[in-house]
Amino acid sequence: MLCIAAFLVLLVLAAVSAKYRRLLGTAWRCVTRRVTFRPCDTSFREDVKNSMLAPLAVRAPRLVKPASIAIEVTAWIMVLSLVLSLYIVGKSGLNLFVYGTCNPQDTQACSLSAGACSIDAGADDFGSALAKGDVVGAFAAEFRSLGKTFDALPSRLKDWDAREYLPEAASYAGGYRDGLPVAVEVIDPGCRFCGELFRNIESAGFADEHNLAYIPYPIGPDAAPKFTNSPLIADYLTAVRLTEQDDVPAMGGTDWRILEHIFTGERPDGVAWQIWFNEQASADEAETQLQDWLAEAGYDAADINDVARLAASDRVHDIVADGKRIVEQEIRTATVPTLIADGALHPGVVSVDKLQGMR
């Protein structure tokens, strides 16, 4: 490993001084033999070590052997660090291409990724498993993560057709219009980045040029969602879609007005509705507010009770669960929001300019 470490050092030195370039050539010949598991055919390794130990041999001969060992250990550390760094850079680049973030478990830890909420934030990664002392689990998590990335790679190279990922009883912003392309967004009502994408879509006039539908995806299991009231909101959105699809009295598009309230509106006290649902509202308070919005949309008391019963039904739960299956097994995104439009998958928040360029 010493000749490899020396080559790395000489590579830097040779870039700034010509006197090291001859040594660099010698080091390279040694490295090419070492990486092909052949012994070096020069004395370069010993020459490097002797040049480093010679001053010490004159002053403190007894320290030569420990210093020689330290040089070998340092060389191993340098080479292993390089290999690890190259692996991390390569894996991060692959994740960035596949998922739009270099860290699918924590999208906000990657400065190159678009704003998004992580779907797999609760899953153990290499570092967290290793911190728990689970070495086997750490490597298993790393290989599992890498395998998922490679498994999802082919799908990122295909031409995406949003119509293939529409949920049951899909609802379109502004209603369905013949002749316009279909787009689908994956959203969690509690994710602030979904609100940011929603506002960008409004600013860009994107829904005017597309039949835009959505899949509600409450991150995490129902028993422990990332955002407390997201499963309830997803159930109500789905129940409203089913209700208005059956032409029960209402103005139509009520689910989109609920999303408009959550992503863009504020309470009278100035607190954003999304923050209120996430941090302040109990389940009963959240449900009462959703029902108030239904009343504003033209639902009477009997209609609201019907929606509430439907939202708690197995039918709605099955539709929401199927939407999560579409996201996890077919779209296989690691982030919310995710937009399927213009023949491509767009993870994270999409800018207004980019949205305006999609046709």
Segments (PLM) and residue ranges:
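Cytosolic juxtamembrane regulatory segments of multi-pass membrane proteins
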Residues: T36-L53, L112-A121
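Hydrophobic alpha-helical transmembrane segments of multipass integral membrane proteins
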Residues: L8-V12, W76-L86, I258
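Structural alpha/beta surface segment adjacent to cysteine/selenocysteine redox centers
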Residues: G195-A295
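Hydrophobic alpha-helical segments
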Residues: M1-T42, E46-V48
